[in-house]
Amino acid sequence: MTAATISPSFNANVKQNKPPSFPSESSNRRPKTRDVASRYLGGTSSFFHQSSPKRCQSPIVTRPVTPSSVATNRPQSTPRRESLDRREVSKAERMLLTSGRSLFASFQADSFTPGTLERRKTTSSATISKSGGGKQEKLKLSDQWPRSLQPSCLSSRSVDFTDTRKKLIGSGNGVARALQDSMVSNRPVSRERITSVDLETESVSSGSSNGRGKMLPARGNVVKARVSQDRLEPSSHGLRKISVDSSVLSPKEANSLSSPRGTSIARGLSPSREVVPPRGVSPSDRMSPLRVRSSLSKNTPLIPHFAVDGKEKIRDNGVADAHLLRLLHSRLLQWQFANARANAVISSQKMREERRLYNAWRSISNLYNSVSMKRIEMQHLKQNLKLISILNMQMGHLEEWLVIDRNYMGSLVGAAEALKGSTLCLPVDCGAMVNVQSVKDAICSAVDVMQAMASSICLLLPKVGKISSLAAELGRVNAKDEGMLDVCRDLLNTISALQVTECSLRTQVTQLQ
């Protein structure tokens, strides 16, 4: 906002001409006007005009008038809080307040003209000179918004009239009575009056008009605003409805009017904020609507044409920023989609490779197990071959032992049978009687058999000794063979070493040659 840098000192010298309020008044001089900064830009209350005590006062000004001998200029950043007393306001004044409030909300915009800013950057208090006593009075709007409490969106701002507790004095009550009579007689309030009141209280560049109530042209287009007020029932707690109709609009202005700022807005006051009609207003304080219209319309400022250009420039910048933001958001979504797809592909490839590695590890483990089993089988076969070779060497001796064993078994079986037969035939109990000759013959036969056995045993003893000697000789031969094998092993080692030496010597000889 380039217009916000205009110094307040220059704005304080700007004077606006106002016509005399009554021809019969003794003090009809042109009063000095002084403006304060707007609540929408500098964080201070909206401006107001100085006038004589008998002049019509704006219904928006709700601060009580406190006389003071010396007018002090207060800084803009230090708003004053004054004591307020509850006063009653008539229905016409409430309608006027609501209409001004709705016009503020409907004609608000994001850019303001330099003229309006110059008028809003002045001090927040002004001195009013009285015609009778020559005293000065300070007026200040009761509705001041701190900077921290301002809404973020200008289209959602609304003027708070909760502090309208001051009973309007002088000709202001006449204006309220005239507006009430015009509403009762079903006569619509003129556009000049409503527009001038709106400009007197807020002077918003996007919705302000000239002294005749016509909107200034924005790039060659004429905008006509028609404000219609509908008086609701008393039970609606002060609800008022204002609709703005446009006949010739540019595309951007049509979009701005089609937005919530330009459509018809119904606002209501809570029961605690409901205003009460004034009491004790005399008929002599009334004023004709024509004089109110003339006094209010001649103080409306003229707005330059480049305000709309600044507004459109800011709007274009906002549209460009929004478009850039959408492009960046779409690009971010594209990158997120690409990253998600890449992550999905990478995860699938990772799972596939892990599966392949697991299968390879499993096949390698199976091969290792099979190789180990083959090695075990090979060792078992080697042991079996060694055992077979040893048994083949001892098979001849085992066959000879089998023949000898058969002969011994036959002789032992014959001796056992003979002894059995001889013992069973002898009666030895129960008074047995034996034949001595037969017993003698039996004993003799047994002795003969034993002698035969002894002779056979004697024949076998040398054979057994011979076999034992052969076995001992076999052991000696085996031990000798083992010694010879050791010697052969040593000889083979020596031969291999000598062969290596011979090969090295031959290579050296070949190198020397």
From Swiss-Prot:
Motif QWRF motif per UniProt: ranges: 334-337
InterPro entries in alphabetical order: QWRF
Compositional bias ranges of the Polar residues kind: 1-26, 43-55, 65-78, 202-211, 244-262
Superkingdom of origin: Eukaryota
GO MF term list: microtubule binding
Stated family: Belongs to the QWRF family.
One cellular component term from this protein's GO annotations in UniProt: nuclear microtubule
One Pfam family here: QWRF
Protein name: QWRF motif-containing protein 9
Source organism of this protein record: Arabidopsis thaliana (Mouse-ear cress)
Gene Ontology biological process: spindle assembly
Compositional bias segments (type: Basic and acidic residues): 79-89
Residue segments, region Disordered: 1-89, 115-144, 184-293
